[in-house]
């Protein structure tokens, strides 16, 4: 499967390296796109090494004027995964804001999109964030629920990056539907 992994600004961004590594090792083609905030938590070089592809971090990375990246990645790939999906990213997509490569790719896509929210429990349980998630689900976006556990901030609650097998199970379920 051709999978775009969008990494957004969350402390859990480093956990997506395991996801990219697993997908690549099982034979999937993986393209990583990172928000600017994601690059503050983990280097794009880590994802480039694991995916064996240049990581996209900007709308304006392209060397070829005829290549429109957000359209290419939104149409020519099988699945888009947003892992971790921050509250900021969920809010932007739920409200049609396409102001970076990640949100532009998601909003331009006609392919399945899987969000993997990961954030502080107070953020995750906030009514605004929950309304954005509800809206996205109603629009047909797929989700892997965050786990409950000790978060990076020292609070225990819902918002933890899910276990890899839970994410892979959902990817395979979506992939099976779209064959």
Where are these regions (language model features)?
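A cross-family phosphate/adenosyl-ligand binding-site feature
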Residues: 1-114, 120-179
């Amino acid at each position: 499967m051709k999978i775009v992994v969008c990494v957004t600004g969350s402390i859990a961004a480093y956990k997506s390296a395991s996801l990219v590594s697993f997908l690549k090792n099982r034979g999937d083609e993986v393209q990583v796109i990172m928000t600017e905030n994601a690059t503050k938590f983990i280097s794009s070089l880590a994802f480039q090494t694991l995916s064996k592809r240049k990581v996209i971090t900007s709308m304006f990375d392209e060397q070829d004027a005829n290549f429109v990246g957000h359209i290419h990645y939104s149409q020519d790939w099988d699945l888009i995964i947003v892992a971790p999906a921050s509250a900021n990213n969920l809010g932007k997509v739920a409200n049609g804001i396409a102001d970076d490569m990640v949100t532009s790719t998601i909003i331009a896509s006609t392919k399945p999109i899987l969000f993997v929210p990961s954030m502080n429990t107070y953020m995750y349980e906030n009514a605004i964030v929950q309304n954005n998630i509800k809206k996205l689900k109603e629009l047909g976006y797929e989700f892997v629920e965050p786990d409950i556990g000790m978060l990076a901030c020292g609070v225990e609650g819902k918002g933890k990056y899910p276990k890899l097998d839970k994410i892979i199970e959902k990817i395979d379920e979506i992939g099976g539907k779209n064959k």
